[in-house]
Each structure stands twice: as C-alpha cells, then as structure tokens.
C-alpha cells in the first residue's frame, strides 16, 4: 500500500519551510516500511484529489495566497468532496486561512475555499512568538512558532488545542487551529511536523485508515 502526498504549489506557498513537513512525512513512512511518494503541484498542473492520500497546503504572502486561491476556486467542488470524504489535509498559516469562507484585510475581502466553517480578519499588529498547545488528540503538547496578522474564528468547530503559551487563533479565545474530519489547520511553524512527530503520525494513520476503508 502506498501513500501519495500532494504538495500544493510549493513554488508559491513556501514562506515557512513546508518542505520540512513533507520530508518528515516521507521519512516517518519510510521508517515504518510504508511506501510513500510526494507529488508537487505547480499552478498549471491538474490535481486529481482521488489519487491523493494527504494534501499539504502551506503558507505564503497575501499576494501569493490570492493567486493560489483564485486557482483553487476552479476546482473547489473536487477539493470539498475530498474533504467531506475524510481526505487528509494539513493546512498551515496562509493555507489555514484559505480553508475558510473569507479573509478580510485592509485591502478588501479575499474569498476562501469554504472547506471548513471558519473565517479570518486582519487584526492590529502581528502575533509573533513561540506557542505551546495541549491537544485532546495527543498526550504530548504541540509546540511551534506563530507569526500571523490574521485573527481566525473557527465558529463551532473543534480547535487543534488549548493555548498554554502564546496567542493562538485570535489572541483572546485561548485556542489554536482547527480540526474538521481529517483536516487540520494551524498557524504553527517550526516546521510543524518535525517538531511534533505525533502529528505527522496522526496524518499518516488517518490516511492509511481511509485508504483501507475505500478498498473494502
């Protein structure tokens, strides 16, 4: 059984070392004898979500996010169907913001992909610091570095974790990230997965479980 990881637009969404997250997933599969491959998608490439087991959506500048969002809007129904069918997604920083309904900035509103019921609005100043979370998903805390101007509201969705140290989604709710089905969105960098191998293993496990369920 092979795990196929789709890395969406690494040439544009490459602000925070997301290739380190890909390398972590590949290595942890290798250590367990799980065959894995990564497919990097450029802007003009066709994406067939039915052939992907894990999707990584990284972070970029507002300009690059807008370029990517306009492209993904054209295949939003396919991406939405993948998410609703328990497809595994890890979305970081700008990618996290793209999951939602919109991102409101001083320059105007950027329509999101509406994959998860959340939205982001630009706040005053940036939230920049180390951050520690306690998550119901893991015994070990989740650690990383946050650097974002957006304030994200996840409505009634489940957060990735409770903030023990740092700001989190909006600097006031006390929570960070979102978990919806097999989608995780977060502002944490580090890179995220090498710092939190338990999270990498969660993604791999859920990808394998989904693949097995589709076979049967």
Where is each model-derived feature located?
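N-terminal beta1-alpha1 cap of cysteine-dependent amidohydrolase-like domains
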Residues: 1-84, 194-215
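Conserved beta-strand scaffold positions in the cores of enzyme catalytic domains, especially
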Residues: 7, 38-40, 115, 144-146, ...
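Short coil/turn connectors at secondary-structure junctions
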Residues: 51-52, 85-87, 109-111, 139-142, ...
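Structural motif
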Residues: 54-58, 90, 185-187
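Cysteine-nucleophile active-site neighborhood
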Residues: 62-135
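C-terminal and late-domain segments of enzyme folds
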Residues: 141-142, 151-215
């Amino acid at each position: 059984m092979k795990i196929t990881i789709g890395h969406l637009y690494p040439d544009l969404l490459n602000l925070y070392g997301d290739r380190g997250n890909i390398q972590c997933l590949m290595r942890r599969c290798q250590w367990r004898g799980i065959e894995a491959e990564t497919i990097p998608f450029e802007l003009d490439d066709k994406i067939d979500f039915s052939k992907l087991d894990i999707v990584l959506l990284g972070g970029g500048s507002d300009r690059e996010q807008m370029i990517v969002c306009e492209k993904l809007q054209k295949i939003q129904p396919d991406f939405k169907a993948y998410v609703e069918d328990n497809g595994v997604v890890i979305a970081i920083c700008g990618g996290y913001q793209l999951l939602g309904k919109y991102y409101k900035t001083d320059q105007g509103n950027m329509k999101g992909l509406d994959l998860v019921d959340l939205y982001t609005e630009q706040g005053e100043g940036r939230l920049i610091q180390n951050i520690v979370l306690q998550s119901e998903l893991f015994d070990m805390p989740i650690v990383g570095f946050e650097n974002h101007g957006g304030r994200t509201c996840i409505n009634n969705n489940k957060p990735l974790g409770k903030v023990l140290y740092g700001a989190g989604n909006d600097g006031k709710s006390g929570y960070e990230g979102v978990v919806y089905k097999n989608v995780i969105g977060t502002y944490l960098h580090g890179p995220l997965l090498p710092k939190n191998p338990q999270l990498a293993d969660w993604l791999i496990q859920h990808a394998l479980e989904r693949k097995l369920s589709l076979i049967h």
